[in-house]
Swiss-Prot record:
Transmembrane segments: none
Cited InterPro entries: RuBisCO, RuBisCo_large_chain_AS, RuBisCO_lsu_C, RuBisCO_lsu_C_sf, RuBisCO_lsu_fd_N, RuBisCO_lsu_N_sf, RuBisCO_lsuI
Gene Ontology MF, one: monooxygenase activity
Cofactor: Mg(2+)
PANTHER family in the record: RIBULOSE BISPHOSPHATE CARBOXYLASE, RIBULOSE BISPHOSPHATE CARBOXYLASE LARGE CHAIN
Name used for this protein in its record: Ribulose bisphosphate carboxylase large chain
């Protein structure tokens, strides 16, 4: 791998700026002695160099191609403050138990980035390096943003504290469900599903990622029937209720139009998909802030680049970007459900969303300290293959500040949708009470649920139907680190 502290940068100006091709390390993109400044943006890449490519040179190439470099010396370098603008790879370490892979730490001067723009950050950090031929694969594992840069983002328009105040719901997770089937229902039937779920005890119902405005149900019809259901359920229960109205559309103008209509109908929350893009997400966040609306983000499409641990972008990075971009909710995994997610790694995603200051936590995949500079917190959402029988696991893993969404676990209940919602609400209330009484819910959870089911027929039916069903598959994305007394 070579001597990582070897002074290999060419400092002689005549040689450094002579026409021709130099190694990236020679051009100044590697500095093993560099100490990152408090104002630097830091990135950790997992790189897999091609056979014969030195790890340090590969790291320097990542730094170069994600900042100022091109493949050859250019004379215009002498017209800029190159020493400041060059990103610097400053540490390379072998990835434990993964031969041929290396962790590459890169520091970027803050002046390389436009303030308040996730789009600009991503254009630099992931814009070019992932298709670079000397690398077999590359993955962005983690990032650290200085407070000076964090402060250029307004962050979530509502945040956890204000959302709970608006809903008047404290001391427990929020409950939701995605309307199923997610495609094909008429507006009237869709609204009926929403009413049944909310009337049975859920706090939220939700559009799924791909329900927009299709021939079987125009978006305006859906909004009208859904909000009629929300209002009736609120009146019947005396609770503030909501339903995530998906305003995702083909243009920003259309998304604004749909969001405005949702507001006029009295909705407290709108939803967009990750696939609309970072600029559109920030634009919708600004609209929600100006209109006192909660913004829910469905992470549709993320698995195409977050799931494989040797190439792509870790979801913990996406979660950090989205907290800066300004969403109030984000789907962050369940650990026990049907979707990808190692429990420790998923807890790391939740910490990124909810911490005031995120500490290094290698078992959970957190490689950098991150001071969030009083930025509002994001409410993580657990959704996908969960049911009432897992309530003790979910509460133990994620605590109170989470939305637990039981789609099939509500709408698939043998006694109907309202009974499914009631089963989930009773399971949650029983588990929160047991926890507050000091009981060990992680181990006593199944018995707590059985005891509650004695006086709740819907919960008993849910437990009989799904029992302790879980999706026990090995996760493809786990943290790689060497256990030591400080991190084990």
């Amino acid at each position: 791998m070579g001597n990582m502290n070897e002074a290999i940068q060419i400092t002689d100006a005549k040689k450094r700026y002579s026409a021709g091709v130099l190694k990236y390390a020679q051009m100044g993109y590697w500095d093993g002695d560099y100490v990152p400044k408090d104002t630097d943006i830091l990135a950790l890449f997992r790189i897999t160099p091609q056979e014969g490519v030195d790890a340090i040179e590969a790291a320097a190439a990542v730094a170069g191609e994600s900042s100022t470099a091109t493949w050859t010396v250019v004379w215009t370098d002498r017209l800029t403050a190159c020493d400041m603008y060059r990103a610097k790879a400053y540490k390379v370490e072998p990835v434990p138990n993964n031969p041929g892979q290396y962790f590459c730490y890169v520091a970027y001067d803050l002046s390389l980035f436009e303030e308040g723009s996730i789009t600009n950050v991503t254009a630099s950090i992931i814009g070019n390096v992932f298709s670079f031929k000397p690398l077999k694969a590359a993955r962005l594992e983690d990032m650290k943003f200085p407070v000076a840069y964090v402060k250029t983002f307004p962050g979530p328009p509502t945040g956890i504290v204000v959302e709970r105040e608006r809903l008047d719901k404290f001391g427990r997770p929020l409950l939701g469900a995605t309307t199923k089937p997610k495609l094909g229902l008429s507006g009237r039937n869709y609204g009926r599903v929403v009413y049944e779920g909310l009337r049975g005890g859920l706090d939220f119902m939700k559009d799924d990622e791909n329900i927009n405005s299709q021939p079987f149900m125009h978006w305006r019809d859906r909004f009208l029937f859904v909000m009629d259901a929300v209002n009736k359920a609120s009146a019947a229960t005396g609770e503030v209720k909501g339903s995530y109205l998906n305003v995702t559309a083909g243009t920003m103008e259309e998304m604004y139009r749909r969001a405005q209509f949702a507001k006029e109908l009295g909705s407290v929350i709108v939803m967009v998909d990750l696939v609309i893009g970072y600029t559109a997400i920030q634009s919708m966040s600004n609209w929600c802030r100006q209109n006192d609306m909660i913004l829910h983000l469905h992470r549709a499409g993320h698995g195409t680049y977050t799931r494989q641990k040797n190439h792509g972008v870790s979801f913990r990075v996406i979660a950090k970007w989205m907290r800066l971009a300004g969403v109030d909710h984000i789907h962050a995994g369940t650990a026990v459900g049907k979707l990808e997610g190692d429990p420790m790694t998923v807890q790391g995603y939740y910490n990124v969303c909810r911490d005031t200051h995120t500490k290094v936590d290698l078992p959970r995949g957190i490689y950098f300290d991150q001071d969030w500079g009083a930025l509002r917190k994001v409410m993580p959402v657990a959704s996908g293959g969960i049911h009432a029988g897992q309530m003790h696991q979910l509460l133990d893993l994620f605590g109170d500040d989470v939305v637990l969404q039981f789609g099939g676990g509500t709408i698939g209940h043998p006694q109907g949708i309202q009974a499914g919602a009631t089963a989930n609400r009773v399971a949650l209330e029983a588990m929160v009470l047991a926890r507050n009484e000091g009981r060990d819910i992680a181990n006593e959870g199944p018995q707590i649920l059985r005891d509650a089911a004695k006086w709740c027929t819907p919960l008993a039916a849910a437990l009989d139907t799904w029992g302790e069903i879980s999706f026990n598959y090995a996760s493809t994305d786990t943290s790689d680190y060497v256990p030591t007394p400080s991190v084990a």
